[in-house]
């Protein structure tokens, strides 16, 4: 065909499988969050919020106590001070596709059902946050310093 698809497929097949860290405290990056309850659902049938993402390291298990960081973020309009309050919850379900899991390991996408108010997880409101064990989470950074330089010219544009 002239598009070198065979070379591309050969290259993809040679990409090494990344090493997985199963021993560190778990960290999962959230790429989706949602409320699985239908409008008008009976109170007895309400479920907690759900977060979807991938585990970076460690293992998550049903029943684990977790924190979601940074959680609720507020900014004082007068002083400009930014504060955050992490959410604490517990894992009540783990799913990959339609499969119920007892535990989840790094790699692939999973859904984590939690004992958390579904309003907190509605409409992807937790995207970019981290799930992990309490007291074993990375620090929250409010400010970062960035050093950059402009390219003198662009090639191929």
Please describe what each predicted stretch is.
Residues 1-154:
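Conserved catalytic-core segments of large NTP-driven translation/proteostasis enzymes
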């Amino acid at each position: 065909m002239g598009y070198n698809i065979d070379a591309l497929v050969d290259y993809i097949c040679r990409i090494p499988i990344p090493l997985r860290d199963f021993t560190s405290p778990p960290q999962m990056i959230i790429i989706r969050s949602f409320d699985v309850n239908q409008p008008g659902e009976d109170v007895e049938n309400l479920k907690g919020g759900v977060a979807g993402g991938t585990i970076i390291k460690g293992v998550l298990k049903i029943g684990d106590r977790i924190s979601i960081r940074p959680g609720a973020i507020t900014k004082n309009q007068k002083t400009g001070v930014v504060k955050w309050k992490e959410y604490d919850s517990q894992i009540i379900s783990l799913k990959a596709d339609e499969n119920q899991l007892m535990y989840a390991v790094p790699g692939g996408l999973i859904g984590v059902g939690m004992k958390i108010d579904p309003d907190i997880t509605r409409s992807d409101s937790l995207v970019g946050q981290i799930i992990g064990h309490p007291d074993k989470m990375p620090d929250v950074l409010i400010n970062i310093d960035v050093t950059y330089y402009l390219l003198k010219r662009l090639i191929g544009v």
